[in-house]
């Protein structure tokens, strides 16, 4: 359904790519939200410390984004997620989980500390309860996977946690990976589209990815791995559900650039955070990134808009 790959040790740049796979399009919108933006979500209210560029899902919340400090966050589906009880004091919803982290934190270390006592509750999106876990990485190369299990947040925090997929929970994915070459087992590379197969395949190709000569090769390398775990339209899972890849993103945490490919368009677009004014008092801006006419740097094409969430 979704896969995230973080290439942190290539010697050129800290780069990440993720796929978005679902039954229907999540209608992504590209947002640039300045620091100092005020948000209210249930009992929680805050003012952002950092500017954020990234994607929303169904105008309900942030699914994939990077902030001006070089911290990125990605929500991926996790069917076995167990959130805190509804009405928990000071809770935020899963739909604003990634946004809350990016608004408050500059590093993975800060995020892990801030999330320690934060209750996260489930809120429906278009009538669906969507279990999810949160992948984080920063410009230092640090990484964390945060999963709501039995009402508590379980944190896996280490730079080597570079690959995330969906179910089962992350610790079980790591155990499954050990059955395959070159991770301690003797099984050959799997070719299916199930979450466990995608996890192994992404880890395998990342293990063998050659050092890039420059930034272009670094971005191309991590995106090529995302391509190996993308799902074409029509291909069924074991449960006969069809969850194609709707888009792929990439984040250059070293140079603060956010890339986007819609799988209904042949073109790549990107936003340079250094070229957009994210200071307090500047307007929130947005762009529909699925327009087939878009190509290249679209930083200047974002226009003022009202936040729907």
Mark where each language-model region is.
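C-terminus-biased signal that marks the final domain/tail of proteins
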Residues: 1-13, 112-114, 123-124, 129-130, ...
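A contiguous strand-loop segment
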Residues: 1-90, 296-301, 308-309
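Short acidic-glycine loop/turn motifs at beta-strand connectors
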Residues: 8-12, 67-69, 138-141, 147-152, ...
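Short, surface-exposed beta-strand-loop junctions and turns on beta-sheet-rich folds
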Residues: 22-24, 79-81, 151-153, 264-268
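A short, polar/proline- and glycine-enriched secondary-structure boundary/capping micro-motif
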Residues: 25-30, 83-89, 155-160, 165-167, ...
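Compact, glycine/acidic-enriched structural inserts
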Residues: 31-47, 79-120, 282-293
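Short hydrophobic/aromatic-rich beta-strand segments that constitute the beta-sheet cores
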Residues: 73-75, 155, 258-261
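Catalytic cofactor-binding cores of redox enzymes
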Residues: 117-153
């Amino acid at each position: 359904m979704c896969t995230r790959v973080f290439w942190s040790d290539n010697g050129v740049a800290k780069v990440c790519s993720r796929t978005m796979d679902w039954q229907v399009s999540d209608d992504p919108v590209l947002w640039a939200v300045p620091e100092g933006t005020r948000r209210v979500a249930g009992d929680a209210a805050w003012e952002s410390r950092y500017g954020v560029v990234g994607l929303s899902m169904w105008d309900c919340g942030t699914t994939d984004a990077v902030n001006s400090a070089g911290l990125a966050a990605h929500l991926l589906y996790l069917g076995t997620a167990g959130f805190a009880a509804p009405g928990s004091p000071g809770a935020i919803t899963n739909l604003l989980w990634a946004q809350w982290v990016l608004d408050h934190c500059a590093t993975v270390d800060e995020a892990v500390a801030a999330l320690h006592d934060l209750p996260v509750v489930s809120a429906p999106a278009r009538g669906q309860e969507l279990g999810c876990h949160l992948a984080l990485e920063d410009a230092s190369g640090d990484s964390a996977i945060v999963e709501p299990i039995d009402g508590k947040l379980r944190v896996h925090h280490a730079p080597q946690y570079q690959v995330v997929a969906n179910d089962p929970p992350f610790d079980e994915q790591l155990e499954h990976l050990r059955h395959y070459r070159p991770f301690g087992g003797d099984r050959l590379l799997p070719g299916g589209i199930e979450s466990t197969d995608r996890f192994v395949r992404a880890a395998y190709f990342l293990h063998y990815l050659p050092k890039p000569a420059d930034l272009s090769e670094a971005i191309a390398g991590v995106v090529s791995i995302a391509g190996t775990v993308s799902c074409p339209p029509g291909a069924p899972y074991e449960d006969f559900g069809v969850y194609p890849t709707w888009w792929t993103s990439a984040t250059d945490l070293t140079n603060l650039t956010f890339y986007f490919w819609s799988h209904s368009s042949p073109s790549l677009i990107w936003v340079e955070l250094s070229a957009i004014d994210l200071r307090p008092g500047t307007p929130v801006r947005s762009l529909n990134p699925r327009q087939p006419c878009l190509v290249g740097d679209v930083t200047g094409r974002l226009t003022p808009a009202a936040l729907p969430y």
